């Protein structure tokens, strides 16, 4: 997989932990990087590539991760990278073709507290929304 370089938003664009109304450090830690490898002869290899990388969110105490499904479809290897740099292999547990979401089960202990699932129905006009990707720091 390609090496990632450390980049960050300028300080004025970063959220202030004391002002967001939730545990920002916990939210950042619950977002992991997923890297996957798909065989060259895979059905989706030509259109989606054989090396894929994206984000996932830990949603259960056992480390279960929800992600976008294309990252894991046909994957023969998955690596999970935590915010503190640990790398654990993962197993593609499920892919839902209707929603496009996938589930990855780590094959080792992540030691990350899961995020609590919310409801989009509770989000209103003018509410603040935060988009968090792997690598954020509080």
Regions found by a protein language model. Name each.
Residues 5, 28-32, 48-49, 54, ...:
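Generic structural motif recognizing short loop/turn segments at the entrances and edges of beta-strands
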Residues 13-18, 43-45, 49, 112-115:
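N-terminal post-signal-peptidase region of extra-cytosolic proteins
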Residues 26-47, 131:
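A short, Trp-centered hydrophobic/proline-enriched beta-strand micro-motif
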């Amino acid at each position: 997989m390609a090496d990632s370089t450390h980049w960050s938003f300028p300080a004025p664009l970063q959220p202030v932990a004391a002002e967001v109304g939730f545990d920002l450090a916990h939210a950042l830690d619950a977002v992991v990087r997923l890297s996957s490898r798909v065989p060259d002869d895979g059905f989706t290899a030509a259109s989606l590539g054989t090396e894929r990388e994206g984000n996932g969110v830990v949603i259960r105490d056992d480390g279960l991760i929800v992600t976008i499904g294309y990252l894991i479809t046909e994957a023969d290897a998955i690596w999970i990278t935590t915010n503190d740099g640990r790398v654990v292999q993962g197993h593609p547990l499920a892919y839902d073709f209707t929603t496009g979401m996938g589930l990855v089960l780590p094959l080792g202990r992540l030691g990350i507290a899961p995020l609590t699932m919310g409801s989009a129905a509770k989000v209103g006009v003018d509410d603040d929304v935060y988009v968090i990707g792997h690598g954020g720091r509080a």
